[in-house]
Structures are given as structure tokens and as C-alpha cells.
Regions:
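Polybasic, lysine-rich low-complexity intrinsically disordered segments
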Residues: 2-4
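Class I S-adenosyl-L-methionine-dependent methyltransferase catalytic core
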Residues: 7-244
């Protein structure tokens, strides 16, 4: 009887250990899947630095643009460039500006108010060997535009990817226009919360296309001071892709 009890106890513990091992393996698989998805979301998609991994900002809940959304954006505005200067405002990891450099832009200016973001952008630029083509500054958006105006800067492409609580993207674009920071025909990529609506056109900005990816919306504007230059406006797409 005692031997039977010992045998049953042994089998019970064996089963418990087996269940524990299976659960541990499942957790490891889930963690590995998460790591793979994160890694896919922070790489250069195309161009000279294609496939190079980009660091995320440590300890911050930034929303780096996923590869699918990034590829969709550049398909709408490029996908490649024959020179030009790009401004990555609210730069975060610098992923969008770095992608533009990788795809042919000559110069990039990165602006962010967080020191950790600035350090991450510099690290990412070094990792993809594009630091010589970039300038990185810590400042808030409004002050940064004043500084850029004094320097006589002008841009062909602008990325505006502010926190979702920021609802004044159109005002910021008008400020850039008044400060003559935009070249004729400049393209502005505005990312914002999908539930929010920006005007299709305003001032000298003409909406070329709007696409929605889960919680994120992207509107492409073109800056034109000459009437009749903006074509292909009023297009809108919806997708199920989400940002991180």
C-alpha cells in the first residue's frame, strides 16, 4: 500500500513538473514573439540602410512607427528621393527621418524635447552610419521653429508625429509657412489619433491623401503657394494595422 502511495505521489509530482515546464515554454514563446514584433517595428525598411535595427527610447512610452505603416507612408510620398532636406519634429527614435535619409534625402534635422530621445536618435544615426548627414537638437517644437527661422532653414519634407494629446498640427504647419521654413511643393506628413479630424485643405496646404491604421491616422499635405498645383487630393484609405 505504501509503495502504491509513493508511486502515485511520484507520478503526481512528475505531472506537476511537466505542467510547469510546458507553461514556462509557453511564456518563453510569447516573449520571443513579442521581441520579434518589436524588432520588426524598429528597423530601417528600405534604402542604403535597409534592415539596420533601430533602438527604442528607454523607459518611455513612445510610439515608433511600425514597418507596415512606415512603408505605406513612404509609398505615398516617395518611395525614394533625389536629394532634399527633411525635418523630423517630435522625432522620438528618429525612425522617420532616418528612413528618409536611407531613401535618398541629403540632410535631416531631428528635434525632440526629451534628452533620452536625443541620445537614442544619435545612437541610431551612428548605427546606420548617417550621422554626418544629420543635425540633432533638443528643444520644444515652437522654439525649434524660431531657431530654424533665424538660421534660414527650409525643408522639402516634414514629419509631424506629436503625442496624441497634441491637436494643433495645422497651427504648427501654418507657423512653419509664416516663418518660410517650407520650400515650394514641400510635403508634410502629419500623424495623429485616428478619431480626430484635420481639415482636408487650409491656407497653402492641400491634403493629398489620408490613411488610417488602427488608432493612427496619417494625412499627407503639400505646401503650394500657386493655385492649381495640388492634384490627387481627397483620397482616403482605412487599414487594420496598429502602431506600437
Amino acid at each position: 500500500m505504501k509503495k502504491n502511495e509513493e508511486g502515485a505521489c511520484f507520478i503526481f509530482h512528475m505531472r506537476q513538473d511537466y505542467v510547469t515546464i510546458i507553461n514556462a515554454m509557453a511564456v518563453m514563446a510569447m516573449n520571443l514573439d513579442v521581441m520579434k514584433r518589436v524588432n520588426r517595428a524598429v528597423r530601417v525598411v528600405s534604402g542604403s540602410a535597409k534592415g539596420r535595427p533601430l533602438k527604442s527610447v528607454p523607459g518611455m512610452s513612445t510610439r515608433p512607427t511600425t514597418d507596415k505603416v512606415k512603408e505605406a507612408i513612404f509609398s505615398m510620398i516617395g518611395p525614394y528621393f533625389d536629394g532634399g532636406t527633411v525635418l523630423d519634429l517630435f522625432a522620438g527614435t528618429g525612425g522617420l527621418g532616418i528612413e528618409a535619409l536611407s531613401r535618398g534625402m541629403d540632410r535631416a534635422v531631428f528635434i525632440d524635447v526629451e534628452q533620452r530621445s536625443i541620445e537614442t536618435i544619435k545612437d541610431n544615426l551612428k548605427a546606420v552610419r548617417l550621422q554626418e548627414a544629420a543635425e540633432v537638437y533638443r528643444n520644444d517644437a515652437a522654439r525649434a521653429l524660431k531657431v530654424l527661422e533665424k538660421r534660414g532653414a527650409a525643408f522639402d519634407l516634414v514629419f509631424l508625429d506629436p503625442p496624441y494629446k497634441f491637436k494643433n498640427g495645422d497651427e504648427l504647419m501654418n507657423d512653419m509657412a509664416e516663418r518660410k521654413l517650407l520650400r515650394e511643393g514641400a510635403v508634410i506628413v502629419l500623424e495623429y489619433e485616428s478619431g480626430y479630424e484635420y481639415p482636408e485643405s487650409f491656407g497653402h496646404f492641400h491634403g493629398m491623401r489620408t490613411a488610417r491604421y488602427g488608432e493612427t491616422a496619417v494625412t499627407i499635405y503639400r505646401y503650394e503657394t500657386v493655385q492649381g498645383q495640388a492634384a490627387g487630393a481627397d483620397e482616403e484609405e482605412s487599414h487594420d494595422d496598429n502602431r506600437e
